[in-house]
């Protein structure tokens, strides 16, 4: 079976699937307990293991398990095992939480929140032949029907990701004379790209990557911090699910950086792909078009939830376009009416320039797919990268073509993608600077745009993963 992960996470082997208990090659140090003597191991007919001590006592031995954190911190392979993700993050986990809620009084229930990405919404709209607004409302109705309390749109959290990316670029552009690694600034919203960068290029590439959190993880901060305060709950009392176009988002949600040590909870507890939501609809015997629409929920009083919104600049979030427009205005006082993209080798590598009197003031690019990412990294290593900013996405054609999106067996993939792109573009685009509720949250929740609180909740850090040298990784 083909792996659902992005190409950047499948580099070291033709078949990157590993069963962690069989093929994980990371050596584990086992501490010897004081006083432990010689013991025998007995294997039962059912495959279970028992330790027999010298005094005749027996103890069942637990199977070694590889957690998702183990995989993320290991350099033995590029990706994590699909089996780990399936057991820890799936629609079955959501159903368990919803079933558990039904067994207790409302005051003892966990508050279940689902945040839906615009890309997943467009994919579902294509499958059910609906427009994106009806899809959003009917999906809200479905989740409420099965026991979810609140349903949000991650386009709202993307406002913050875009604004922080814009500010970071302007700050780095102004400070490039003092720091050689200030530019180019590379987008950080794609977890497949981040995982590849940490494990393959490490300390060389990481200083170039934007520290702005992705929309998923900003939504994690909004739900587990701001919204939890509004509901007078601690973060661990909220179960937060996101619906994403990409399996790699499961890896992102599992990063230790997004784990609250005080309350022992993640910012995002479970990530469902678009395909898993479709499977959930099938298992519940629900046809999305047959549902009555329900209004979307709003995170704060100033934010409108009448209809879903989106952003200009393509199906991956529009990072290049928003950074370009903001930088042109902020750095050079130029208001860009229309952004003109120039395709280079292929449609997944395009560039944009801002010129004045024949001089190039800004040079930005987008690089989608592993082939283009490789070319970009090689140019950086040779010191021949002409760009100030690059929107990097691991999937060819970007997030609308993510591995978790719905496929149509009776329809060519290119035709389906074009249809999804059209549906995605039907949603009203909103400038993050003008979005209702955003400035209110910067003022009252984050205590300002450049505050310590904004840095902690809207930004993250990256970690180079050192290569482990072990003969166990050799395949003969």
Curated annotation (Swiss-Prot):
Top-rank lineage group of the source organism: Eukaryota
Keyword annotations of the record: 4Fe-4S, Acetylation, Iron, Iron-sulfur, Metal-binding
GO biological process: iron-sulfur cluster assembly
Entry GO terms, CC: cytosolic [4Fe-4S] assembly targeting complex
N-acetylalanine modified-residue sites: 2
SMART domains named in the record: Fe_hyd_SSU
Keyword Iron-sulfur: yes
Record-listed [4Fe-4S] cluster 1 binding positions: 24, 71, 74, 77
Gene3D superfamilies (alphabetical): 3.40.50.1780, Fe-only Hydrogenase (Larger Subunit), Chain L, domain 3 (3.40.950.10)
Binding positions ([4Fe-4S] cluster 2): 190, 246, 395, 399
Family (UniProt): Belongs to the NARF family.
Subunit description: External component of the CIA complex. In the CIA complex, interacts directly with CIAO1 and MMS19.
Function: Component of the cytosolic iron-sulfur protein assembly (CIA) complex, a multiprotein complex that mediates the incorporation of iron-sulfur cluster into extramitochondrial Fe/S proteins. Seems to negatively regulate the level of HIF1A expression, although this effect could be indirect.
Name of this chain's protein: Cytosolic iron-sulfur assembly component 3
Organism: Pongo abelii (Sumatran orangutan)
Highest classification ranks of the organism: Eukaryota, Metazoa, Chordata, Craniata, Vertebrata
């Amino acid at each position: 079976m083909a792996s659902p992960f992005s190409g950047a996470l499948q580099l070291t082997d033709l078949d990157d699937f590993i069963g962690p208990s069989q093929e994980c090659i990371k050596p584990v140090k086992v501490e010897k307990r004081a006083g432990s003597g010689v013991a025998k191991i007995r294997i039962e007919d059912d495959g279970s293991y028992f330790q027999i001590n010298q005094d005749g006592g027996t103890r069942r031995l637990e199977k070694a398990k590889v957690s998702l954190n183990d995989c993320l911190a290991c350099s033995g392979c590029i990706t994590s095992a699909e089996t780990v993700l399936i057991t820890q993050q799936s629609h079955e986990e959501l159903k368990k939480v919803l079933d558990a809620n039904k067994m207790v009084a409302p005051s003892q229930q966990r508050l279940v929140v689902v945040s839906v990405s615009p890309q997943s919404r467009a994919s579902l709209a294509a499958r059910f032949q609906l427009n994106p607004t009806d899809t959003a409302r009917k999906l809200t109705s479905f989740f409420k029907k099965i026991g979810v309390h609140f349903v949000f749109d991650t386009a709202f959290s993307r406002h913050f990701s875009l604004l922080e990316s814009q500010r970071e670029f302007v700050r780095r552009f102004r400070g490039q004379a003092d720091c050689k690694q200030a530019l180019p600034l590379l987008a950080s919203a794609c977890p497949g790209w981040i995982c590849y960068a940490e494990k393959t290029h490490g300390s060389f590439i990481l200083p170039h990557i934007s520290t702005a959190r992705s929309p998923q993880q900003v939504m994690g901060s909004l739900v587990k911090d701001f919204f939890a305060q509004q509901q007078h709950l601690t973060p661990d009392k909220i179960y937060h699910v996101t619906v994403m176009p990409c399996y790699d988002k499961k890896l992102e949600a599992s990063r230790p950086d997004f784990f609250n040590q005080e309350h022992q909870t993640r910012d995002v507890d479970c990530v469902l792909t678009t395909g898993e939501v479709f499977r959930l609809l099938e298992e519940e015997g629900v046809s999305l078009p047959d549902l009555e629409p329900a209004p979307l929920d709003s995170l704060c009083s100033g934010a409108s939830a009448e209809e879903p919104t989106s952003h200009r600049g393509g199906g991956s979030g529009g990072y290049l376009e928003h950074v370009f427009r903001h930088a042109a205005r902020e750095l050079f006082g130029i208001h860009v009416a229309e952004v003109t993209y120039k395709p280079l080798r292929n449609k997944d590598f395009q560039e944009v320039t801002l010129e004045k009197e024949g001089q190039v003031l800004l040079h930005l690019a987008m690089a989608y797919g592993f082939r283009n990412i490789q070319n970009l990294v090689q140019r950086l290593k040779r010191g021949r990268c002409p760009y100030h900013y690059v929107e990097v996405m691991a999937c060819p054609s970007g997030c609308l073509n993510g591995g978790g999106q719905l496929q149509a067996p009776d329809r060519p993939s290119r035709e389906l993608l074009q249809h999804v792109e059209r549906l995605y573009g039907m949603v009203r685009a909103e400038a993050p600077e003008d979005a209702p509720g955003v400035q209110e949250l910067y003022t009252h929740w984050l205590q300002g745009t450049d505050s310590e609180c904004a840095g902690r909740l809207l930004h993250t850090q990256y970690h180079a993963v050192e290569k482990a040298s072990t003969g166990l990784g050799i395949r003969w």
